[in-house]
Regions:
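Conserved acyl-donor/pantetheine-binding loop and adjacent beta-alpha core of acyl/acetyltransferases
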Residues: 68-104, 148-149, 173-187
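Active-site rim helix/loop that mediates acceptor-substrate recognition in acyltransferases
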Residues: 36-64, 73
Length: 213
């Protein structure tokens, strides 16, 4: 039986107490397909400092008792790296109106307990409390169906994301590099953006784009 499960939001310096636990969890979970990320604590600590230093950012942490078993990050797109911000600018979006639901990680044993839904709900609620956002977005790495490390029977999360109201936007993608666990060097990856709009109108850039879903 699991210890009591809970979820809490953290902003600013309050995240510091859990920084290393979240960093270790990200390395552990993102090592699996499809990310295959060969991570290290030094990079993860630097990356997570973005969320400590940005007062509008949020990290949602899932606990089993006192143990960190999941984490989900979100930040206004205007404070994200150029790799993620510029594709939106080029597509006609105002980064100040997009809240970026960056990443979610959860230990395998704790999947299927509603944490994935809560991660989206908590980040969107945080964005609503901040105000001024018309869109929520995240991205997912693109891997070929024939990838040698793709597990048998692997199912992407597209169906889950659709249920949360997100749609893949055709042509909206970023390039970002990291080292795969089976590669000697860092390589660039394509990440496709998914978007959820609050009361979209005909003037929204996404309205003129045809999604493949």
């Amino acid at each position: 039986m699991f210890p009591p499960l809970s979820i809490r939001r953290f902003t600013g310096a309050a995240l510091n107490d859990y920084l290393d636990a979240v960093a270790r969890l990200r390395i552990e979970v993102f090592r699996d397909f499809p990310y295959l990320y060969d991570g290290n604590m030094g990079y993860e600590r630097r990356y997570l400092q973005t969320y400590v230093k940005c007062p509008q950012a949020v990290v949602v942490i899932a606990f089993a008792g006192d143990e960190v078993v999941g984490a989900s990050t979100g930040i206004p797109l205007q404070f994200e790296e150029d790799n993620f911000r510029q594709p939106f600018v080029a597509a006609g979006f105002d980064p100040r109106e997009v809240f970026y639901c960056a990443e979610s990680v959860l230990r395998k044993d704790y999947r299927g307990h509603g944490f994935g839904v809560r991660f989206f709900d908590e980040r969107e609620a945080h964005a609503q409390a901040l105000g001024g956002f018309r869109h929520y977005a995240f991205c997912a790495v693109v891997r070929p169906p024939e990838h040698p490390l793709r597990p048998p029977g692997y199912q992407p999360l597209d169906g889950f994301w659709h249920k949360r109201g997100y749609r893949k936007v055709a042509g909206l993608a970023a390039q970002y590099g990291w080292k795969d666990i089976d590669q000697p060097h860092e390589t660039s990856k394509t990440l496709e953006f998914w978007l959820k709009s609050k009361q979209p109108s005909a003037s929204d850039p996404v309205s003129a784009r045809k999604s493949d879903h």
